UniProtKB/Swiss-Prot annotation:
InterPro entries: ATPase_NBD (IPR043129), Heat_shock_70_CS (IPR018181), HSP70_C_sf (IPR029048), HSP70_peptide-bd_sf (IPR029047), Hsp_70_fam (IPR013126), ISC_FeS_clus_asmbl_HscA (IPR010236). It comes from Shewanella woodyi (strain ATCC 51908 / MS32). This is Chaperone protein HscA homolog. Chaperone involved in the maturation of iron-sulfur cluster-containing proteins. Has a low intrinsic ATPase activity which is markedly stimulated by HscB. HAMAP family: HscA. Keywords: ATP-binding, Chaperone, Nucleotide-binding. Belongs to the heat shock protein 70 family.
Length: 620
């Protein structure tokens, strides 16, 4: 008897893949789960036909509410209802409070500086809250697909740093879910649009979600998906539009100190007005006060545009920087892909269209496009598409390196390097008999450690006690596909090694994300001057250290006059190197070198004499 092939309308009759994997867009405002079924990628609805799950979690004495129910009760119970938790991921409490005012939560700081929400269910951190959002998405997928998932691909903003990425993986880990990969949201969007299928050239992905903004410049060439440059802001999104409108309404209604409940209702109303202004030139905002009084105010589209104009222009400035970093011009960009619900705002589309000089792609629902791309990638990673030649090459947004003598930065992996990547460099000891070496891993573009971001410190012990410069320590930086860094230091002769996986206690602050690159360009000339000075000071210290050891060992080879001349030159170098004149230090080193030429020759002669002592010509 022949088997009937049954497929859903509009889909192929190919049987469902036996390896179950999904893509999850863990968003600031809403989250979605998508899968490839019968060869077609699409988001999966819940039993009420809702595709998106509000990223809202409410903690009560009875239990935990997630999604629509939590959102519905958020106005009456704001202290126990966590919204936009993605903005808290991997960031310090002080950083969060400096960026967003009027938070209704009772917050505490954990031992490592991370925020903790105090709720009726007890204390929870952003990772645990994120896990609660992931839980119904995973459950929905397994119920719909009819089996246990082999893994998930979770999308993150390209600008997420190590702490934020690790927090996202840890949230999935709390559920026992295997993370196949963290995928940058803009890259996922490009996959969803099928821009890898035959098209070649430069693509811009403009991703403005609820809490984050990313711009990625991609080059597509013969199946290779390379990210040329990334930029953005991990604390700029539609939520900020809501807060600006919220502040505007507070001012119009002269509400100086609204209660937490009223504040939440007003924020919800601000979001409704924002969304309604997408298709209307004027919308009436209304709110009922705690005493029952109802207030109304007409908000014109022009007024809303004025409120958000500076933020939208800020995203365009990021686009300009990303193009410069990628080494391409506006004219070279073939397509501009719009991602994220906030790209529905007319002013956003208008300014992006104007900047790139072409109408952006919006045919796929901007709220679903990222999850769909993640599903396609998950399908590939579990082996359901072995014929796929899609290759994703993400890049590092900031350089990684280590501190060297004098507080200098030696960059090991440069900014915009394609990942995954492994790079190594050899270093040596500074002092005779040195048996340990401390490593300080830093991130940034500046020349001095003080101007970069500290990531981690570790120590390599067990180095053979050799002369300065004789030991060889190989330092290897490895960055995996998720952008997580591990650093290993190994002494080559013994094989002794030490390593560390970098998981910063919290992420970059808003100011750091926006200014690190600008600072490096603005201070480039001054940084080089400071580096040259530091290098001369390190060299002076090395020369003095080496010469002091030589005098202690072989001073008998010198006359009193010769020794006095050398010591005077050493004192002069020591005095000059305490000042900030690189040229003077260099000249003092040269003067000391000239005064020690005869001493060096005498030491060489003496070493040869000692080596030949007691040996015959025949034995030599």
């Amino acid at each position: 008897m022949a088997l009937l092939q049954i497929a859903e309308p509009g889909q192929s009759a190919a049987p469902h893949q036996h390896r179950l994997a999904v893509g999850i867009d863990l968003g600031t405002t809403n989250s979605l789960v998508a899968a490839v079924r019968s060869g077609v990628a699409n988001t999966l609805p819940d039993d009420k036909s809702h595709h998106s799950l509000p990223s809202v979690v409410r903690y009560t004495q009875e239990g935990v509410e997630v999604g629509v129910d939590a959102e519905a009760n958020s106005a009456k119970d704001p202290q126990n209802t966590i919204i936009s938790v993605k903005r808290f991921m991997g960031r310090s409490l002080s950083d969060i409070r400096s960026g967003v005012q009027d938070l209704p939560y009772q917050l505490e700081t954990s031992e490592n500086g991370l925020p903790v929400f105090v709720t009726e269910q007890g204390k929870v951190n952003p990772i645990q809250v994120s896990a609660e959002i992931l839980k119904p998405l995973v459950s929905r997928a397994e119920k719909t697909l009819g089996g246990e998932l082999e893994g998930v691909v979770i999308t993150v903003p390209a600008y997420f740093d190590d702490a934020q990425r690790q927090g996202t993986k840890d949230a999935a880990g709390l559920l026992g879910v295997k993370v196949l990969r963290l995928l940058n949201e803009p890259t996922a969007a490009a996959i969803a649009y099928g821009l890898d299928s035959g098209q070649e050239g430069v693509i811009a992905i403009y991703d403005l979600g609820g809490g984050t903004f990313d711009i990625s410049i991609l080059r597509l060439h013969k199946g290779v998906f390379e990210v040329l440059a990334t930029g953005g802001d991990s604390a700029l999104g539609g939520d900020d539009f809501d807060h600006l409108l919220y502040q505007h309404l507070l001012n119009q209604w002269q509400l100086a100190s609204p209660s937490a409940t009223l504040s939440r209702r007003l924020l919800i109303e601000s979001r409704r007005v924002k969304e309604a202004l997408t298709d209307n030139i004027q919308v009436t905002a209304s709110i009922k006060l705690d005493d029952g009084t109802e207030l109304t105010h007409d908000v014109a589209k022009a007024t809303f545009d004025d409120l958000i104009s500076s933020l939208v222009k800020k995203t365009v400035s990021s686009c300009r920087r990303a193009l410069r970093d990628a080494g391409v011009t506006n004219d070279e960009v073939l397509e501009t892909v719009m991602v994220g619900g906030s790209t529905r705002v007319p002013l956003v589309r208008e300014l992006v269209d104007k900047f790139f000089g072409k109408e952006p792609l919006t045919s796929i629902d901007p709220d679903r496009v990222v999850a769909i791309g993640a599903a396609i990638q998950a399908d590939i990673l579990v082996g359901n598409k072995p014929e796929s030649d899609l290759l994703l090459l993400d890049v590092l947004p900031l350089s990684l390196g280590i501190e060297t003598m004098g507080g200098l930065v030696e960059k090991i992996v440069s900014r915009n390097t394609t990942i995954p990547v492994a790079k190594a460099q050899e270093f040596t000891t500074f002092k005779d008999g040195q048996t340990a070496m401390a490593f300080h891993v830093v991130q940034g573009e500046r020349e001095l450690v003080d101007d970069c971001r500290s990531l981690a410190r570790f120590t390599l012990k067990g180095i053979p006690p050799l002369a300065a410069g004789a030991a060889h320590i190989r330092v290897t930086f490895q960055v995996d596909a998720d952008g997580l860094l591990s650093v290993t230091a190994m002494e080559k002769s013994t094989g002794v090694q030490s390593s560390i996986q970098v998981k910063p206690s919290f992420g970059l602050t808003d100011e750091e994300i926006g200014t690190m690159l600008k600072d490096s360009m603005a201070n480039a000339k001054e940084d080089i001057t400071r580096r040259m000075l530091a290098e001369q000071k390190v060299e002076a210290a090395r020369v003095l250290e080496t010469l002091s050891a030589a005098l202690q060992k072989d001073a008998v080879l010198l006359t009193e006059s010769e020794r006095s001349d050398i010591e005077q030159a050493m004192a002069s170098l020591a005095q000059i190197s305490s000042q900030d004149d690189a040229d003077a230090i260099e000249k003092a080193i040269e003067a000391l070198d000239a005064s020690t030429q005869d001493f060096a020759a005498k030491r060489m002669d003496n070493s040869i004499k000692l080596a030949l002592k007691g040996q015959s010509v025949d034995s030599i």
